[in-house]
Amino acid sequence: MSSKSSKRKKITAAQRKEVLNDFRTALESRQASIMGRREVLTGKAKFGIFGDGKEVPQLAMAKFFREGDWRSGYYRDQTFMLASGIMTLENFFAQLYGDTDLSANPDNGGRMMNNHFATRSLDEEGKWKDLMKQKNVSADISPTAGQMPRSLGLALASKVYRQEKDLHSLKQFTSKGDEVCFATIGDASTSEGHFFETLNAAAVLKVPLAVSVWDDGYGISVPIEHQTAKSSISEALKGFEKGKNDHTGIRIFKAKAWDYEGLMETYRKGVEVCRKEHIPVLFHITEVTQPQGHSTSGSHERYKPKERLEWEKEFDCILKMKQWILKGGIASEEELSDIEQKAVQRVKEARRNAWNNFQKPILRKRDDFIKKVNISTCRCLKVDKIDKLLQELARIGEPTRRDIISTGKKILRLICNTCTPQESTLKKIVTKWLNDEFADNQLRYSSHLYSQSKQSPFKIKEVPVVYENDAPMVNGREILVANYDHIFSKYPEALIFGEDVGHIGGVNQTLEGMQKKYGDLRISDTGIREATIIGQGLGMAMRGLRPIAEIQYFDYLLYGLQVVSDDLATLHYRTAGGQKAPLIISTRGHRLEGIWHSGSPLSMVINSIRGVHVLVPRNMTQAAGFYNTMMLSDDPALIIEPLNGYRLKEKMPANIGEFTVPLGKPEVMTEGTDVTLVTYGSCVRIAQDAVEQLRGFNVSVELIDVQTLLPFDLEHVIVKSLEKTNKIVFFDEDVPGGATAFMMQKVLEEQGGYRYLDAEPATVTAKDHRAAYSTDGDYFSNPNAEDVFEKIYSMMNEYNPGAYPVIF
């Protein structure tokens, strides 16, 4: 397994100082891993995953990471964070303890487990900071390889900034595109499709993406021969390698994890090529060790053979670095021993400081609560039980907020109701204290799912659509063409990409002529690669651009759903408001033809991407209004255009590109008095047909288009209708128990609509199976106007059989 190190040269005093500083950083990082594991095993922390064994290669990578650059990595990169000066040892332990104080844990405010890193791109008001004055780290996620799609967008932004001269003025985001995205990944995770899809796209697009693969030979317990072709990712990727006459491809570099000098030279060469020439590079770092195993969940001694464990001790990168220092006469054994001892003490100090800072506010909170209860003038009948609870709370040496809240709730249950409000000071005290604590903890753990800035879509002024008297009737797609033209003219940072988006102007011609007018960088075609289309948009949005990522059909969003769910939807939340990605995902869906061109799986989406707004316009005018709203907002959104509406006639608005449609505001399409019918998207036209049919049978239906599912009816329009009609039907093309069940829960439970019901609420949905092919297949798979008619008429028959006799 060993390999000869590169030839050594004499070093200067400055270089000596740098080497010893690197050695100190590596030692401190290793000790942080060791002590961090101990904190978990002794119960102070919940879980630990560390970067031991990867210290030396990360020192090298950090040398060439500069202000304005971006990292898109994973949970092994603590040494890189320390060496880059982005994280302190106190930050490391604060993260391990789950400290919610952003000054101590700026990465995520206690919302993610340890070693999940992020820098803060936004100020306290949610505005962009100057990202060129800091080293940037995009927020990590646990799903391995999940960082790869995002890295494509972070790198592609540099290409856009370099080539689009109109964007050179955006100096808080770029220095003419010289920024590199550094991605890191473990060797086992290179087996994920995200990895290959990202590398392929990066090679095709020619972007400055520098990928480091930490190859320690295992994916938890599974050895590399079961993971990777040829047991080597660099060998497996030979076909990607850029030859002398190749137009596209990647450069591949290999180095040993313990070869300090060789690693420095390898990263110097690779990053220089990547930065200057915008060629993706892969650093395959081999012979990596993992001294403590995968995580605190278990020991690697269970699955690694004795020979491997012995080799890992011999080729530990820090030990090898020490031997190299001694052999080169850079420092003496005594000097290195002193550095080692000081590293241990420094990490112990950081651990102690972080723990004290974490515990102090909780201890103060506990003592304050006990004091408040004890000074109460109220003496309840169950005072002995209350005193016992307080004593138990006081005895907890390292309390959590949960301990205090739980005690408060139990005490509240014991307070008697025999006292008058004037006498029962204890109940007032405990109730107010609990309410205040819930409000505080809402901010600690539940804030920033969506934007709270002035650019929140809920703060965007509604601008109604305006029509001239002689407004022409046009195909719906033409409204989108005109609206896109306005967007790309108004916002130089706006761009759109997807399959068939560029050259032919989209499969439904909604971007006709846009590439010719705005260029193939802003209006661009992509390969068939939905996961990285989403990642491409996500990364660019994090760097100040305004991307629109088109997924050709809603059915194919599933390929990219993991990226939306785990990364995009959680970004603002998991950084406690520190990062944002105002990406618009554009797609088209609902009924058309066949299993995979008629999908409307809204329940799958709305239940997996909370944090992304889900907008379901009934026509292209409403869709255009949503695009305009979201371009003014800093939240991400999924806009699902009705697939069968591009050739339907609509009036051309006079204020195209300017009108907006508010989020969470249903529209009453038809007023009625008997039944409330709630739907969205393509189902609106079907519902309108059913309403007309029912009118002929003396049934008055109030038809409501919800317009957006996330958010849903913020003004309680639907429950106000239900208060009038006392009967309600929810209608869509999702599966039974899908989005109709979601809407029902919102209206009946959350809005309290159950109290107005005079009849059992009903749903009209598609079948459990996918929609069959052909007109008849659609008719017998998806709900139609006749189904809606029958459901509502049956409801009226049950309510008043004399007025509405059985007709079926």
What are these regions (language model features)?
Residues 74-75, 145, 151, 184-185, ...:
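Short beta-strand segments
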Residues 579, 589-593, 597, 602, ...:
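Active-site phosphate/pyrophosphate-binding segments
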Residues 31-212, 217-219, 223-247, 595-597, ...:
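Cofactor-binding active-site loop characterized by glycine-rich and histidine/acidic residues
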Residues 60-61, 82-87, 193-197, 215, ...:
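Short acidic, glycine/serine/threonine-rich loops at helix termini
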Residues 55, 59, 136-408, 643-808, ...:
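Thiamine diphosphate
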Residues 1-46, 75, 449-461, 791:
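Cofactor-/ligand-binding subdomain signature composed of acidic, glycine-rich
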Residues 383-543, 555:
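Non-catalytic terminal/interface segments that mediate subunit docking, oligomerization
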